[in-house]
């Protein structure tokens, strides 16, 4: 009998805005941010094993097998659910590492949701999101799969419905260290909190942008080039830069001009992640 298999998408996210309100006693930063998904991402294939072994068959340069967030997510879920089954995992990786579009966090969330389904654990979203938070602050939004206004370190989520434009996303060929940006002495850390709900339109500033563009000329260049066509923004701590367009045709036209010299892609913004749409279709 062939082992049960499942292939799931692992979508990218954008931070449509990112405000840093202050530094907490535990060293983390208090944030307010707006998450939206892209219909673009990695693809992860899972095959159940009956011997309890967890094996990721795709190698990542410079990332030991057991340190990979996918493997850590699988092991934590296996331990906390006391599941005796194992899993073989393959990933078709297109999202950049250190790009600010949530590649690792999204992979971890897809793993938690995929294994919950294949191992028939019956965990609810709250329980999976709580486990996800122990792996990273951005994992819960991918577990929940809905565009959200996030507070705290990014884990307190309120569902929102921003517009869903087409985006041009540019991928400067640098990996930005989040820790480096958050420890920069020039980082703005005192933005007043947004208290109005829903969050007013037009709050699109990313407090990390001045520091990132100062440290990384490649990011600055991408912002300047995309900024000739639309408001160019930084997602997360970068390196990826994005801008919205009303139609795919317009986004494609700008992308064609810019990707002669830069790496990038076009994707539709989505308030319900393509991972959750796929999981719904399995029910």
From Swiss-Prot:
Recorded metabolic or biological pathway in which this protein acts: Isoprenoid biosynthesis; isopentenyl diphosphate biosynthesis via DXP pathway; isopentenyl diphosphate from 1-deoxy-D-xylulose 5-phosphate: step 3/6
Gene3D superfamilies per UniProt: 3.30.230.10, GHMP kinase, C-terminal domain (3.30.70.890)
Superkingdom to which the source organism belongs: Bacteria
Protein EC: 2.7.1.148
Xref: InterPro entries: GHMP_kinase_C_dom, GHMP_kinase_C_sf, GHMP_kinase_N_dom, IspE, Ribosomal_Su5_D2-typ_SF, Ribsml_uS5_D2-typ_fold_subgr
Catalyzed reactions: 4-CDP-2-C-methyl-D-erythritol + ATP = 4-CDP-2-C-methyl-D-erythritol 2-phosphate + ADP + H(+)
Pfam families: GHMP_kinases_C (PF08544), GHMP_kinases_N (PF00288)
Descriptive protein name: 4-diphosphocytidyl-2-C-methyl-D-erythritol kinase
Taxonomic source organism: Pseudomonas fluorescens (strain Pf0-1)
């Amino acid at each position: 009998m062939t082992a049960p298999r499942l292939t799931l998408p692992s979508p990218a996210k954008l931070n449509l805005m990112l405000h840093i309100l202050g530094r907490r006693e535990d060293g983390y930063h208090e944030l307010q941010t707006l998450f939206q998904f892209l219909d673009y991402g990695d693809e992860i294939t899972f095959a159940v094993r009956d011997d309890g072994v967890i094996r990721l068959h795709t190698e990542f340069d410079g990332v030991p097998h057991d340190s990979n967030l996918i493997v850590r997510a699988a092991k934590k879920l296996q331990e906390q659910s006391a599941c005796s089954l194992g899993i073989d995992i393959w990933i078709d990786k297109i999202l950049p590492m250190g790009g600010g579009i949530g590649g690792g966090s999204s992979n971890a969330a897809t793993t938690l949701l995929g294994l919950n389904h294949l191992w028939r654990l019956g965990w609810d979203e709250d329980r999976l999101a709580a486990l996800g938070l122990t792996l990273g602050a951005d994992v819960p939004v991918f577990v929940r799969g809905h565009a959200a206004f996030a507070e705290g370190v990014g884990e307190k989520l309120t569902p929102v419905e921003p517009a869903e434009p087409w985006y041009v996303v540019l991928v400067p060929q640098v990996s930005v260290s989040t820790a480096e940006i958050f420890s920069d002495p020039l980082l703005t850390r005192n933005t007043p909190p947004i208290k109005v709900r829903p969050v007013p339109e037009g709050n699109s500033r990313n407090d990390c942008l001045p520091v990132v563009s100062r440290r990384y000329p490649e990011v600055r260049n991408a912002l300047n080039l995309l900024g000739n066509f639309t408001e160019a923004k930084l997602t997360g701590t970068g390196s990826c830069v994005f801008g919205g367009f009303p139609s795919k045709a317009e986004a494609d036209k700008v992308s064609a001009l810019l990707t002669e010299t830069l790496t990038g892609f076009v994707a539709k913004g989505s308030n319900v992640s393509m991972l959750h749409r796929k999981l719904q279709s399995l029910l």
